[in-house]
Amino acid sequence: MRYGFTTGSCAAAASKAAAYMLLTGKRKTEITIETPKGIPYTAQLVDIVRSEKEVSCAVEKDGGDDPDITTGTLIYAKVSCVDCAMEAKQGHPQIVIDGGIGVGRVTKPGLDQPVGNAAINHVPREMIEKEVLQICSLVDYKGSLRVEISVPEGEGLAEHTFNPRLGIVGGISILGTSGIVEPMSNQAILDTIKVELNQRKAQ
């Protein structure tokens, strides 16, 4: 059976590509990242929109042979300069990550992210930051960048997930610990049960 890639991997790939196009001025049609599992992921880029201060692009989620409702969904990343002309005060790039349309927002304690944050879990956040910093290093950019992840179909898809029950409103979560989706794995259900138990403990 064919494995797929998580929403976190898609978000990281789109973020890396958007950062590359913004900071180099060159167009990309595909990008490769390394997943936490060590398996490389080469993503095709679609719906590329470029301007001087921001670039957005999308990656189509491929769940492999896993019956995942997000398969075929476009995961977008928009990368913009906070101030392209200035270096960050710390002397190294600062990456700010947030969720846009179709990415859920946390409203209850006990989840991976604090209340008020976008439901982009810590491993995808680390993946996004790592890939974007790699591009910053490539071009010796030391300023600040804002990364916004969005999923236009996310709000509708979220109705078919555990998110409403967990207090995540407005969209899906950006998930993944290994970066890949193993076909017919029970891990996602076990992870959701664990999250719900942690949440009850926090209340």
Spans of features found by a protein language model:
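Generic N-terminal targeting/processing segments that precede catalytic cores or assembly contacts
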Residues: 1-166
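Glycine-rich anion/phosphate-binding loop at the beta-strand->alpha-helix junction
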Residues: 152, 156-159, 163-203
